[in-house]
Curated annotation (Swiss-Prot):
The keyword Cytoplasm applies. GO terms for molecular function: deoxyribose-phosphate aldolase activity. The keyword Magnesium does not apply. This is Deoxyribose-phosphate aldolase 2. Pfam families: DeoC. It comes from Staphylococcus aureus (strain MSSA476). The gene is deoC2. The active site is at 89 (proton donor/acceptor), 151 (schiff-base intermediate with acetaldehyde), 180 (proton donor/acceptor). Pathway: Carbohydrate degradation; 2-deoxy-D-ribose 1-phosphate degradation; D-glyceraldehyde 3-phosphate and acetaldehyde from 2-deoxy-alpha-D-ribose 1-phosphate: step 2/2.
Length: 220
């Protein structure tokens, strides 16, 4: 697959303006990225602007804390799909995971998967807040809940993806679930490390820099 198709071109800052959203949409169309990932308030606009494009619209649910109620996450998902979202990146209930309330975590994910009605669901487990066993368990619950991807990070918790965590997640979920690496993927070197570790989607605000690095690379 072309490397550009691995990238969710991302802008999730709370102060994001319409001008900045326009910029990432234009960049995504120019570089043929897989999607633009924007906050729910921008989904309808992005979907309208990308209607004549292969670029998908990705949005975030229960973001960035994961601490919304399950019903709220399900409604957010339904609303996002209605507004034109193609893909949903949700945040798990991190506290419930740490409590050992695994049924609650799985049911939370399942509610979003159901609300997404067949659209791609990626589950953010916020690896920087988890230990090894918690990363494994969160990945297992993601798979059991029927989601499509397990994702490392929101980028809002003080850390992002590491190749070690990506490999652990991939080893845990196997072939049935994909892994998205996000948070701190800023250049071609970072991108390559994540892909080599098993990521098949990269969430990054630095998609253009990554592609420029690829273009400069003799193997491109």
């Amino acid at each position: 697959m072309h490397s550009a198709k691995l990238i969710d071109h991302t802008l999730l800052k709370p102060e994001s303006t319409r001008t900045q959203i326009d910029q990432i949409i234009d960049e995504a169309k120019a570089y043929h990225f897989k999607s633009v990932c924007v906050n729910p308030t921008h989904v309808k606009y992005a979907a309208e602007r990308l209607a004549d494009s292969e670029v998908l619209v990705c949005t975030v649910i229960g973001f960035p804390l994961g601490a919304s109620t399950t019903a709220t996450k399900a409604f957010e998902t339904e609303d996002a799909i209605q507004n034109g979202a193609d893909e949903i990146d949700m945040v798990i209930n991190i506290g419930a995971l740490k409590d050992g309330r695994f049924d609650d975590v799985q049911q939370d994910i399942e509610a979003v998967v159901k609300a997404a009605k067949g659209h791609t669901v990626k589950v953010i487990i916020e690896t920087v807040l988890l230990d090894h066993d918690e990363i494994v368990k969160a990945s297992e619950l993601t798979k059991a809940a029927g989601a499509d991807f397990v994702k490392t990070s929101t980028g809002f918790a003080g850390g992002g993806a590491t190749a070690e965590d990506v490999k652990l997640m991939k080893d845990t979920v196997g072939a049935d679930v994909e892994v998205k690496a996000s948070g701190g993927v800023r250049n071609l070197e970072d991108f390559n490390k994540m892909v080599e570790a098993g990521a098949t989607r990269i969430g990054a605000s630095a998609g253009v820099q990554i592609m420029q690095g690829l273009e400069a690379d003799s193997d491109y």
